[in-house]
Amino acid sequence: SVAVAEAFRDHFGFTDSPPEKRVERWRQWRTSEMWDDDLVWLAEDETGIVGINVCLREHGAKVDQGYVASLGVLPPRRGIGLARCLLLTSFAEYQQRGKASVSLHVDADSITGATRLYTGVGMHDVETEIDFELEIRAGKDIVVR
């Protein structure tokens, strides 16, 4: 959806894609064995969808752990508690399902304040990863000759 793309536009590594590619990605997710329609929450206002929380049944082989795959709020609606509400709703659902814990991955340098949100709801850092990346775009020669 457009709302999902806009919510992640300022996320590390974001690259925009045509709507048909986004639809295809959603189809792939929805056919995954980890997908559950009851683990998707939307925040809406008079303009439409302004926030989304997509969770998966479990985190890989960790069957007792739920996984927050994608949590995002449109920039104009950030800072009013929507992400917190969406996140706490998923925690309650996982607790109902008997999960022992919930995990997610986050860009620790996110300009959105995501790490403050997660620590504010009681989550803590269990693993820190540093990724190195070189962005290569078609038509841009980066080789030093």
Give short role names for the model-derived ranges.
Residues 65, 94-106:
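Conserved GNAT acetyl-CoA-binding A-motif
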Residues 78, 87, 102-105, 118:
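Hydrophobic multi-pass inner-membrane translocation pores used for secretion
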Residues 43, 77, 81-89:
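Conserved acetyl-CoA pyrophosphate-binding loop and the N-cap/start of the following alpha-helix
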Residues 75, 104-114, 132-137:
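Conserved beta-strand-loop-alpha-helix junction that forms the acyl-donor binding cleft
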Residues 1-21, 144-145:
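Short amphipathic alpha-helix that is part of the acyltransferase structural core
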Residues 80, 84, 109-127, 140:
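Conserved active-site alpha-helix within GNAT-family acetyltransferase domains
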Residues 12-71:
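A conserved beta-strand-loop-helix scaffold within acyl/acetyltransferase catalytic domains
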